[in-house]
Amino acid sequence: MAITRILVSSMLLGGLPLTAQGFEFAGYARGGWGGSEGGGTQSCFQLPGAPAKYRLGNECEQYAELEGSQALYEGVDGTRLKLDGMVSLYNAYGHAPTFTGEHGDARLPQLWMSLSLPALQGGSLWAGRRYYKRHDIHINDFYYWNPSGTGFGLEDYRLGGYTLSYAFSREDNIHQPDKANRHDFNVGNIVTNPGGALEFGLGYIQRGQVENAHSGWSLSVEHKQKDFLGGENRLVAQYGVGPGIGLGGTGDLRADRDVRSWRLLESPRWQLTPRFGGMLLVALQRDERANGGDQTWYSAGVRMSYAFSQHFKLVGEIGHDRVETEADGTRRLSKFTIAPTLSVGPGFMKRPEVRLYYTYARWNRAAQRAAPAGSALSASGAFDDALHGSNIGVQVETWWGG
């Protein structure tokens, strides 16, 4: 291990790919500074009731994930034992970067081990806490299908061209107040057309050990088309009942079978030329709740980038969210961001990037009334009683490995 540490340090200093003695290093990081039009710290725009926000020029934290994996054993027959761990760091804008307390944290979101054996047909056995088969939309950081957690399973066993997976987990995330056993079944690589394949996921949540708990389930189906306009396209349908309303995660354990949610997503990402790329999202989610708590979320947004040179891009993003509720009418939020950007390459997904940005947003009274006190949309937030506001700032974003 001492030799490995020396090699790792040398490669970091030399800017070389970080793999040595079976060790791999990957990660993600973003950080910067932002201010609001009134002179205070940047305050970010998210519609109450919407599970995500369009994030270009609309992120209010320093955040990093640092992941390392070490091959503990590699046999000539393909047997491989691997240990994987990740540290995440979070700190809100406007506060000292201590990564502790009310405005920051340091966590260990992943620590797990996997064993790959020839008999598993390309699959592996695993146990621990990990990110598991996560699906997300990049432009609003929406993890619409995320059965991650602490548990064990069999991943990607190949059978007749398909991949079969099973996972048992007890906890989705650190914020989950109550625990319940969750079983996730996944079938992938169901080829439908050249470059296109289906993936099915069924989640079953057992009745939790809390008062008035219920069991529930969810079903997710995704069609992914590769090489679509130089990128890819995703079409997703999800449905959940009871605690399955988490739609890929665990929802409220007290939700009964009359509580339901469904969601539809369409999201193409393109790179039409080496200079012009982008991503679009159209989403619809319906939540049926007891006691007049039904709501419907509509979302549409697009981010586009055009590279004027090898290292300079102009990036723009427009997003609109609407939440219709029975209790307090329809909430609306629209935002626009323009961001001159320096990058290592002209592609839409090329990173690192350094961006200057200007973001403008508008919302209605219903959104203001529903907003948490002190948040951007509230009457006690950075923009007072106004129904619009703007931010400026600079941000760096990068990812590597993985």
Summary of predicted features, one role per range:
Residues 192-207, 212-326, 331-336, 342, ...:
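Detector for outer-membrane/organellar transmembrane beta-barrel domains
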Residues 31-37, 72, 87-93, 129-133, ...:
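Transmembrane beta-strands of outer-membrane beta-barrel pores
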Residues 23-29, 74, 79-87, 123-127, ...:
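Transmembrane beta-strands of outer-membrane beta-barrel proteins
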Residues 64-70, 110-115, 152-156, 185-190, ...:
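Residues on the lipid-exposed face of transmembrane beta-strands in outer-membrane beta-barrel proteins
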